[in-house]
Amino acid sequence: MGKIIGIDLGTTNSCVSILENGNVKVIENAEGARTTPSIIAYANDGEILVGQSAKRQAVTNPHNTLYAVKRLIGRRFDEEVVQKDIQMVPYKIVKADNNDAWVEVNGQKMAPPQISAEILKKMKKTAEDYLGEAVTEAVITVPAYFNDSQRQATKDAGRIAGLDVKRIINEPTAAALAYGMDKAKGDHTVIVYDLGGGTFDVSVIEIAEVDGEHQFEVLATNGDTFLGGEDFDIRLIDYLVDEFKKESGMNLKGDPLAMQRLKEAAEKAKIELSSSQQTDVNLPYITADATGPKHLNVKISRAKLESLVEDLVQRTIEPCRIALKDAGIDVGSINDVILVGGQTRMPLVQKTVTDFFGKEARKDVNPDEAVAMGAAIQGAVLAGDVKDVLLLDVSPLTLGIETMGGVMTALIEKNTTIPTKKSQVFSTADDNQGAVTIHVLQGERKQAAQNKSLGKFDLADIPPAPRGVPQIEVTFDIDANGILHVGAKDKATGKTQSIVIKANSGLSDEEIQQMIRDAEANSEEDRKFEELATARNQGDALVHSTRKMVADAGDKVTAEEKTAIEAAVVALEAAVKGDDKAAIDAKVEELSKVSAPVAQKMYAEQAQPAEGAAPHAESAEKADDVVDAEFEEVKDHK
């Protein structure tokens, strides 16, 4: 069996690592660098350049030089964040036939996994050159807050690059592995604050010593998959464009060549300002007009840069707060803070983290290499070369299905340790319903419509039965890569149907962030909605069971009783259509009161309960483990 390499597929830079003789080795690329720019260029002669060579020619070939493609992976074209990116990058982002965001180079449309695969190929070749043997297996890292479709797309990129992706693991978890392997014995809790080129993640991780084994358990994770060093660069680029416009009256944003030079200069200035108080951005011949060539020369102080990006740094603190709350611990319980990602070298970021957590971050973890090193350790664990490490990661968002009344019923809560498998029994909403539609959702809201739809599938050929009698078992299974598989089974017939969530149907980061923010802000609204939906379902069930009881009773019900019951039923049906929970509760009580004498009369006359009454009893009063589900009936037209 060959070596399993660890790859950090980053937004700005990528890195490859291997475990050799018990030590983790970061492998230098052909240019002698330990990290490779995540940049791909398509030359006019058809050559594909990757890494430093692509970066060097970017100024002369801006339209065909692709960078930060990871921000597009697993995303829809119409997402707001993609539309924002279109304004900022010199290359062309286009809408694919499946509505995904793709890029166009030399008239050819390409999917982000296809482009990311070129970087992975470079990483694979780097490892092969070093090892002197073929490499076919890898562990690839992704931001902890990547959703299902983004993980799937990353796996696809690996497959395109000729790699069997043995595991997708979360970047902060990988960094904790790299940090925790050589630590002294004993338990400790760490925060991994990962601010990379395009994404931000924070994870609370408990590292425990159990019978000589290092156990890494992720207690909670949070983040923002569209916040990173690229956004800091954009702020600086915008500032430089504005300064140049004030001075010359010319807008550089329409000039791809000038913008590419500005991007490089802004990135360089940002890096310099981490160690200097001031720097110059000097770009001669940036553009020209009728009066001649124009030069850009702007002095930038560290204080100026900090004022431009202060709100971006502050945006990282709320996810930290939520992660601590979800983990059920306070700041005082944190033993160490680990900074990962090149952007954490910025003094303002370090100060903000120190102020929030009340302790200095550790400096013994290389922010650019820790993630790839952790991936290599996980690769060695999977290969059986490392036996004393156990990694317990989590699913970042709640997963469930839509049930009766437009409610999202959760099957797997957020921050559940993966891999995991959960099942729940649901039933039908109508008598003789022949098929159900399973609507899979991801998000934190109680109202199904407020969450993201991941997919739908049908389970057909359910034998005719009263509503509430069929037993439909829905199973959610998240594998160790965080990828979701959903299945449904009719327990009576054994018929099953399943779905793997496809790569083009995932959540956008803004939606995820918004869901959790909304869930925090609207928890009271959600609670009221849930109570109203429960009351409506109770009212519907009572109407159904009462009408059935009256029909079964036949002439045992007097005309007066029938009239009173029908009036109460109509009143309850009207109340259920409204939004007043108290009114529904009152009408439920009223109908229960007027129908009680008939129920008592029938009970008294039935010395022996009829065997056939069992399904009715079960549909009238649901068993605790059966949830009413609003499934669509699929008509079979023959």
Swiss-Prot record:
Residue(s) carrying Phosphothreonine: T199
InterPro entries given in the database record: ATPase_NBD, Chaperone_DnaK, Heat_shock_70_CS, HSP70_C_sf, HSP70_peptide-bd_sf, Hsp_70_fam
Induction notes from the record: By stress conditions e.g. heat shock.
This protein's record includes keyword Nucleotide-binding: yes
One GO molecular-function entry: unfolded protein binding
A Pfam family of this chain: HSP70
PANTHER family registered for this protein in UniProt: HEAT SHOCK PROTEIN 70KDA
Family: Belongs to the heat shock protein 70 family.
Name this protein carries in UniProt: Chaperone protein DnaK
Source organism phylogeny: Bacteria, Pseudomonadati, Pseudomonadota, Gammaproteobacteria, Pseudomonadales
Gene name linked to the record: dnaK
